[in-house]
Design a protein with these regions (language model features):
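Single transmembrane alpha-helix segments in multi-pass membrane proteins
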Residues: 1-52, 77-82, 230-244, 276
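Transmembrane alpha-helical segments in multi-pass inner-membrane proteins
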Residues: 199, 209-275
Length: 295
């Protein structure tokens, strides 16, 4: 049970991000800025709490507004410019991470900041985002429950609502969707906002778990979430994907990452695994796409 707890905890953070990433990918777009948004969100919460003397709930709300504004700007820039979202959000990644590091150094002289556990509202936020649920005598992080709720909500949205139909149609053919009256631009902007929300959610979990922030804590999370989505069957070209498949992809990553640690293998081998899985997933994805298009 202890081993299951460890890999599910890792999988839950990947999985929450991957739900947002997968929905956006199904709509035919990418967001490479979510990793930097985790660092941005966590540092903004901590700075507002420790340096600005805000309560953690209020600081978290302010951070949420800032984070979804970045997501909105990403989406608006993509739909208005017509440029690939890969390029737009790659630029956003560097802008957000650079600003987060620069502002953190200007205010505190550091890129890591703690002391949030003594702040007002910490116990309340911690109980919501980083407490434990006891099952069969084993304490499981509440983030696992949040992950399950995200999966259920994503599955219902994608498979049982008109919005889900719009997402599939937008990814399959933007032009045809617009001719059918589907609000393609609004769908895409909304999904960019949702991926930003997912990044903020992970940031709150991390801040309340570790009692502080590190500007680099979300580094490479964007790639892990994308790979988890692709492993789960989401097409890189859009128009097809499964939230349950994405959940399995996140579980695979969690098991491998913890397996490497438990085996006493150098953690750098996880980078090798990521690369192998990315190439393999792309190859399988290409084969699956041909069957999907011609089948």
């Amino acid at each position: 049970m202890q081993g299951m707890k460890s890999y599910l905890q890792v999988s839950s953070e990947i999985g929450i991000l991957a739900v947002g990433v997968a929905l956006l990918m199904i709509a035919g777009e990418f967001d490479l800025s979510i990793g930097s948004l985790i660092g941005f969100s966590s540092m903004s919460i901590t700075l507002l709490t420790v340096e600005g003397n805000m309560s953690i709930p209020l600081a978290s709300l302010c951070s949420l507004l800032l984070t979804i504004f970045v997501g909105y700007c990403n989406g608006l820039t993509v739909v208005k410019s017509g440029l690939p979202s890969f390029i737009i959000t790659l630029g956003s990644l560097f802008i957000v991470r650079g600003l987060t590091i620069a502002v953190s150094k200007i205010i505190t002289g550091r890129t890591q900041l703690g002391g949030i556990s003594e702040s007002s509202g910490y116990d309340f936020m911690s109980s919501l985002f980083s407490s434990n649920l006891t099952i069969s005598g084993v304490d499981f992080p509440i983030s696992i429950l949040w992950w399950i709720l995200f999966v259920i909500a994503g599955y219902f949205l994608l498979n049982h609502t008109q919005i889900g139909n719009w997402i599939f149609a937008t990814g399959a053919s933007k032009e045809s969707s617009m001719l059918m009256g589907i609000p393609v631009n609004q769908v895409k902007i909304s999904l960019f906002i949702f991926t930003a929300f997912c990044a903020w959610f992970i940031a709150v979990i991390q801040v309340t778990t570790y009692g502080g922030a590190d500007v680099l804590r979300g580094e490479q999370k964007e790639f892990i979430a994308i790979i988890a989505a692709v492993i789960g069957g989401t097409l890189l070209t859009g128009g097809y994907g499964s939230i349950l498949g994405v959940m399995i992809g996140a579980m695979i990553f969690g098991m491998v990452k913890q397996g490497i640690i438990f085996a006493g293998v150098d953690a750098d081998w996880f980078q090798v695994f990521m690369g192998v899985m990315l190439v393999s997933a792309v190859l399988v994805n290409g084969t699956f796409r041909k069957k999907y298009v011609h089948g």
